[in-house]
Structure formats: structure tokens, C-alpha cells
């Protein structure tokens, strides 16, 4: 095994270095290696497999679709499968939650969804800066990486990561940091050196930066703050969405409505690459 990977696969790899086991089979929450050993998969594809490996009810649909020669790639042309998806998503996910979003298909990955959200926010507001929180992880392409605080990831960029401000999260500075007050002071003080951002982006539950759950009260205060200063609120649901937190959208528990929502990973259902960006109609 190691000879093939060491000789032909790039050194740019991560998880396998810490756990050099060759997998061969997966079902539900169990994965099996080539020696027959079974493991509970707590990796979960980093949130891409919320419904388990090879769930029968999705697998059957996929096989039938392929056997019927369903459309696999169509750029952004109109297709019947896309029409059915949008209709189903509207009726089953958005309307029951009183969410009036337009659905944008940005590309296959979560970082694509984040990049689109940043471009939309900057275009809509005419501002450049985006505020994110310490402990954030939003992706590995340059725009998304500029929001990410992990040092090793940022250092790998090889270029300056600009137009982003990282705000101390409430758990920072020894805990109980008044983040809202701090942001307000940055905007109200003419000598702070900061200007009003186009958007503030948040994972309601940070994962890569440690399991930090932002309180309902903080999320509500953040929504009020963004509205007060005409700042767009972006919720990154890429890893915590699709029922991973108990509700389909992780922000539901706070009863807030973000301006833009980024989705990927388990929205593909089967570990397949798929992403959405949801945006309020006035931003479209």
C-alpha cells in the first residue's frame, strides 16, 4: 500500500498521515479496512456524510437516475432535475421555515459557496472588508482562506490575505468577551482605523477551530447589530448544516434570518460534490 501512495501520490495530504489505514468498504457509520477491521467513522467526511455511508434510499435513487441516462452535467442550463430540486427545496425546506431565499448554484464545493457570498456582499454594499471571528474556518481558496484563522492554512497561501478583519469571539480573551460592544466601538470611534464591513460571516457552531457553540442570545444580538449598521449577515452552514446540529439550518435555534446562507457537503446527500448559496431576494 505505502509504496504506491508514497511513490505516486503528492505529499499534499493530511488525514492519512496520522491514520495510515487503507479503507475498502463503508456502510452507515461503519468503515472497514483491507484487513477486515471495522471502525466507527467519526470523521463523517467533515460533515459531508450526515446521512451515513451509502444510505439505501439515496443509493437506489442514484442508481436509477444513472440507468435512465439522467443529465449529469449541463453547465447552468435549465434541466428538469434542477427544476425538481428547486421546487422540492422550496416546498420542504424553505417555506416551512418562512425563509424567502433565492437559490444560487455556485459550484461543487463549500468554498465555492463562500467565495460567491463574499462577491455578492461586496457588490451589493459597495464595501470591501469582511469581518469573521477568531477560530473560524471557511475554506481553502483565497477569499475563504482570508476568513480562516488557522495559522498553518493561512501560511500555505503564499500571498497576503487582505480585506478581512478577525473579531475576537465571545469565548476569547479568557471568556465572556463582549464581542458586540467591541464591534460597535470599532465602528463608532473615528480613530479605530476600521470601516464598516460589507458582511460579517459566522459558523453558528465552530468546528475546525474547536467545538464552540455561539449562544442564541449572541446570534440574535449579532443579527440586530448587522441590521443596525446595514451589514450583511452570512451564515456558513457548509459543515454544520443539513441537520448536523439537530435542525436543518443551525441558525434556526436562534430564530434569526441571515442575509446569505452557504451550504455544501451533506446537501449532496451521498458525499457527492454539491453546493448552494441562498440569498435574500433584494441581494439577487
Regions found by a protein language model. Give the residues of each.
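Conserved N-terminal phosphate-binding loop of PLP-dependent enzymes in the Aspartate aminotransferase
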Residues: 1-284
